[in-house]
Structures are given as structure tokens and as C-alpha cells.
UniProtKB/Swiss-Prot annotation:
Function, as annotated: Small polypeptide acting as a regulatory molecule which coordinates cellular responses required for differentiation, growth and development, probably by restricting polar cell proliferation in lateral organs and coordinating socket cell recruitment and differentiation at trichome sites.
Sugar-modified residues: 8
Region: Disordered, residue numbers: 22-63
Originating gene: DVL15
Pfam families, sorted: DVL
GO CC term, one of those recorded: plasma membrane
Sequence segments annotated as region (Required for DVL/RTFL small polypeptide activity): 111-142
Protein name: Small polypeptide DEVIL 15
Keyword Lipid metabolism: no
Cell compartment(s), UniProt: Cell membrane
Annotated InterPro entries: DVL, DVL_RTFL_polypeptides
Superkingdom in the source lineage: Eukaryota
GO process annotations (BP): negative regulation of cell population proliferation; shoot system development
Length: 144
């Protein structure tokens, strides 16, 4: 088999370099990958990547479509730290599940934060009491 017949390679813009791979035998999954770089050589480069895997049009519409995206961008132009996000989603009942899930997670996060705050406050008060007792004993020992 000839490699050129199996893989088609296309490039679009010079700023947006996009590569699409597809097989001539109609694969079940198609892939796309894009990279965006800044056009000025003096500024630091910013990369944005996206990757999606979907069933081809020959598959039935009842199949689930899975999407995955990844992005890496500096928070400021001078910062070297990268902010990343990655998610995998299914298209079935996504809107109702995601809203209830985010509410549940925010309630759990608030309750955990409240518990941690209470434990830290108790620990601080115990430490203060013990510190006062030790100081009192030291002073009592010196004066007796």
C-alpha cells in the first residue's frame, strides 16, 4: 500500500497550522489537530491545541460523540506558568447532568472548606491555651 494514498495531509493558514489526517478506507474515527503560534518573533509564543475524536458520518446517530480539548496558554505575556484545561464530554444529557453536578460539587466544596476552617480555628485556640499555660508555668517556676 502506498503511504500517500492512506494519509491526506493539508495545511491552511500560516498562523493557524492545521493538519487533518484521514484514511482512504473511511475510518471509524477522524482526528484533527491545530496549533496557533504568535506572528511576531519578539513576543513569547502562545500555543493553543485542540484534539477531537468523533465517529465518522457512516456511523449511526445514536452513537455517543466524545470530544476532548486541551489548551496551554500563559496567564500573562511575561509569565512562564501555563494554565491547562482538559475535558472529556459525552453529548447525551450533558446540560442537565453538568448543572446538577456543578451544584453538588460547589456545596461539597463549601462544606469541606467550612469544616477545615473550624478545625483550624480549634487548633489555633488550643495552641494559644497551651502557650499561655506553658508561659504561666515558666513564670511560676522562676518566681517560686
Amino acid at each position: 500500500m502506498d503511504v500517500e494514498k492512506l494519509w491526506n495531509h493539508t495545511k491552511k493558514d500560516s498562523i493557524f497550522q492545521t493538519t487533518h489526517f484521514s484514511s482512504s478506507s473511511k475510518p471509524f474515527f477522524t482526528r484533527s489537530f491545530s496549533t496557533k503560534t504568535s506572528s511576531s518573533p519578539s513576543s513569547k509564543s502562545h500555543f493553543t491545541r485542540s484534539f477531537s475524536t468523533k465517529p465518522s458520518s457512516s456511523s449511526s446517530s445514536s452513537d455517543l460523540i466524545f470530544r476532548r480539548s486541551f489548551s496551554a496558554k500563559p496567564k500573562t505575556s511575561k509569565s512562564l506558568l501555563l494554565s491547562r484545561s482538559c475535558s472529556t464530554k459525552s453529548s447525551a444529557d450533558l446540560s442537565s447532568k453538568s448543572s446538577s453536578l456543578s451544584r453538588i460539587l460547589s456545596k461539597k466544596g463549601a462544606s469541606v472548606t467550612g469544616k477545615c476552617f473550624k478545625v483550624a480555628k480549634e487548633h489555633k485556640s488550643r495552641f494559644y491555651i497551651i502557650k499561655r499555660c506553658v508561659l504561666m508555668l515558666v513564670c511560676w517556676h522562676k518566681h517560686s
